[in-house]
């Protein structure tokens, strides 16, 4: 990736883009569900199926979890029809209907599986597909930067960058929830992008975290500019921030000289202090631009 592409891939807008792309796969119920069972053909109106689709999509569960629920929800609608016809179906009948080829095929058409690598490869190689989901998020010139210069011959042959790996992780979590650890320790946090931080945050969504870093020393173009921003993307906006502004390694005279850059590099950060004072150790020497 170029620095510009990596920066855009680390932008939090990518989370919205990927969410849209995944959930766009959910179809619309235009045809009724028809389930043959014995001598009967049980019919569920399309509008009832659509209500189930809307309810599952609005539950806030992962795409894959909702997809797994759909056959049982459809089978339940079939059972309601059986009961209205005077039958007394039980849970075993519902399970059998949910496993039937008619329900499985119908559910797969409305809620197809999504594979993260295929999804991302499509977005990065198809300008029309990218624009469909990114049109109001990324400017046309930004979309052009995101697109691969030379799309792979097949999606299986795609070569993923480090920035792509984080997007694949985001996609995987949209499909199935990432398990949370009890505690995560993160060092050098100042160099991470918002999407990096989201990936770490998923690993401690129900746990805790210790995050270390110096915002003023961020070395990447995609780095965040404040602890407030970093912790928000990490999913811990209310976390306690302990400022460690005393050090021994660098003499006070050097710190004082370097701190002149703070207002430009990290506005709002306080000046660090050194417990070691060595007057006269810092010598500033003017030199030519070519030296």
Per-region residue spans from a language model:
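Phosphate/oxyanion-binding active-site loops and adjacent basic polyanion-contact surfaces
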Residues: 14, 70, 163, 167, ...
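Conserved helicase NTPase catalytic core signature
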Residues: 28-183, 192-197
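Hydrophobic alpha-helical scaffolding
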Residues: 4-12, 60, 64, 93, ...
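Conserved helicase motor core of SF1/SF2 NTP-dependent helicases
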Residues: 1-6, 169-183, 190-291
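Generic recognition of well-ordered alpha-helical segments
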Residues: 17, 106, 257-260
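P-loop NTPase motor core
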Residues: 2-33
């Amino acid at each position: 990736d170029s620095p510009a592409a990596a920066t855009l891939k680390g932008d939090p807008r990518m989370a919205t883009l990927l969410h849209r792309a995944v959930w766009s796969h959910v179809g619309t119920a235009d045809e009724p569900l028809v389930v043959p069972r014995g001598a009967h053909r049980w019919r569920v109106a399309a509008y009832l199926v659509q209500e189930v689709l809307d309810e599952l999509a609005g539950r806030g569960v992962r795409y894959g979890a909702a997809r797994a629920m759909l056959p049982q929800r459809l089978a339940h609608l079939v059972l309601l029809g059986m009961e209205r016809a005077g039958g007394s179906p039980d849970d075993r009948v519902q399970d059998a209907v949910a496993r039937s080829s008619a329900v499985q095929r119908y559910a797969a058409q409305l809620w197809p599986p999504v594979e993260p690598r295929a999804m991302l490869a499509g977005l990065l190689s198809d300008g029309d597909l990218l624009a469909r989901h990114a049109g109001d998020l990324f400017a046309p010139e930004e979309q052009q930067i995101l697109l691969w210069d030379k799309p792979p011959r097949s999606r299986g042959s795609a070569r993923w960058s480090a920035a792509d790996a984080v997007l694949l992780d985001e996609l995987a979590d949209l499909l199935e929830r990432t398990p949370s650890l009890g505690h995560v320790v993160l060092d050098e946090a100042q160099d991470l992008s918002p999407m990096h931080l989201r990936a770490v945050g998923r690993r401690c969504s129900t746990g805790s975290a210790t995050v270390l870093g110096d915002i003023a020393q961020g070395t990447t173009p995609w780095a965040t500019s404040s602890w407030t921003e970093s912790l928000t993307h990490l999913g811990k906006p209310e976390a306690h921030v302990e400022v460690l502004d005393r050090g021994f390694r660098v003499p006070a005279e050097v710190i004082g000289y370097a701190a002149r850059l703070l207002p430009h590099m990290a506005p709002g950060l306080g000046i660090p202090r050194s417990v070691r004072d060595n007057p006269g150790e810092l010598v500033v020497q003017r030199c030519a631009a070519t030296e």
